[in-house]
Amino acid sequence: MNKFFVLFIAIFSFVLSLSPLSAKRIISLTPSLTKNLQYLGSENELVGCTSYCKTTRKIPVVASAVKVNVEKVVSLKPDLVIASTLTQPETIAALKKIGVKTVVFPMAHSFSEICAQFLQLGKLIGKEAQAQKVLRQINQKIAKLKATTTSNQRVFIQLGANPLFAVIPNTFMNDYIVFAGAKNITQGMTSGSITREAVLTRNPEAIFIVTMGVFAGQEKREWERYSNLAAVKNKKIFIIDSDKACTPTPVTFAETLELIMKNLK
């Protein structure tokens, strides 16, 4: 009888090890993962985050943009720490070494990868059904947006000013342009660094300036100086919110795509 009991316990423990984690104390080291937790209805389980995370309630800050306070993380006794590859490998190794369950999500290079990681997070915290529900809604929204695509315009999405940086292929932000049926003027480039002269030569018909600090308005006025630029003639130089545009979540992707497509019409 005891042998059967021991066998039952062993099997039960194995099944539990395969089941999703119902984490009750989560620490997020990346703003996009914090947003995803909110979309999954799990903000109440969040016990620590970075100084850049936006939350609806006050949550202990355990990290800046570049440094994680490992001691504070440990003191909060998390069931799970989620991070991106932007977190220092040494920090991840230190957390794992002391037994803190830590999962690192790689940088998403496409909308499909954003969705896959969202579903992975849902499974990880026992919210797979909610993740699937959100993804169904978002994919339906994007399908409707893509069905209205009429644009074939040359588009430039600007990320920085000094130096000038652009959205390039093989990034999730490039999918904004692709899904809108437009053409990225940086097609063929493998680095985001670009000169103003190169942009003028490619003559975009629409420019989207992603707000990062106070430079956006200045950059818009700078582009408007070039009266022969197609985007200036078309009056299609726009400023978009970096908090949404640069954050790889299914929800913010759909919101940004909708805005871009509206402005391209």
List the predicted regions and their residue ranges.
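Basic- and aromatic-lined ligand-binding clefts that recognize polyanionic substrates
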Residues: 24-38, 129-180
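Boundary at the C-terminal end of the N-terminal hydrophobic targeting segment
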Residues: 17-23
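Structured C-terminal subdomain patch of bacterial secreted/periplasmic proteins
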Residues: 24, 113-123, 130-132, 136, ...
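A short, structured surface patch at a secondary-structure boundary
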Residues: 25-86, 103
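His/Asp/Glu-enriched short active-site or ligand-binding loop at hydrolase and phosphoryl-transfer sites
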Residues: 50, 60, 170-192, 239
